[in-house]
Amino acid sequence: MTAKVSLEEKFRETGGKRPYVQRLFGRIARVYDPMNRLMSFGLDQRWRAFAARYLALSSDELGLDLGAGTADLSIAVIRNSGPGTRMIGMDITPEMLEVGRIKIARLGLEDRIDLQVGDAEHIDLPDNSVDGCCSAFTVRNLTDIRQGFREMLRVVRPGSRVVCLEISHPPGKMFGFLFYLYFYKLAPLFGTIIGKAFEEYNYLPNSLTTFPDAPTLKAIMEEVGWSDVRFYRLSGGIVAVHVGTKV
């Protein structure tokens, strides 16, 4: 049985991909941040800072962070934006948001970051209501990638950007081999030994099997209506930041 079939069977057992992902991240919420630091060798914070600089909201503007999780990207956007900038962070997993709220309170940012339970494919906001939208490691978990990008396009104001940070497929044989070795072999091992969560961290490589590479994701964004779409490969292409504008 292939990894893809196995993952699809897990989705069926839990009623679909969305409830599976919600349950999975709920179980690892308390170890999510330290495991991210460990598994990325600390690079995940640099990647988020890079993405945040491309969103870089002006003073008093409102941004939206989809799949906000523990709020690292929302915090990075606030740090890279003008005074009075505010963020709405949405995620389908309450346990992740609770970790994020503790972090936000510790930093004294409660009046600038509002975390809410919400679905990136059905955003509970009016059309043209935010000045920018971002996500980190969220698009891969969507049931329908195109629907997610359509919703992002709907809620941002004309002239605003979307910035998406995602694990990607690096070009070239050397980085491709290292990518395969790390994400398909070592990451589940780290998750098992340190996080005691084999299924959760085995989901990571399995979810990448059918996830589009950076040029294909760019084409999907253009297909649903985003303009001036470009992407930036980081760390040899193991992650990519996609940027698009609503005209």
Task: Name these PLM-found stretches.
Residues Y32, C133-C134:
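Hydrophobic beta-strand segment of the Class I
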Residues L62-H122:
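Class I SAM-dependent methyltransferase SAM/SAH-binding core
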Residues P83-G84, V156-R161:
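Short glycine-dipeptide loop
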Residues E121-G132:
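A short acidic, Gly/Pro-enriched loop at the edge of an enzyme's catalytic core
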Residues L165, H169-I220, V224, R230:
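C-terminal alpha-helical "lid/dimerization" subdomain adjacent to the S-adenosyl-L-methionine
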Residues S227-V247:
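Core SAM-dependent methyltransferase catalytic element
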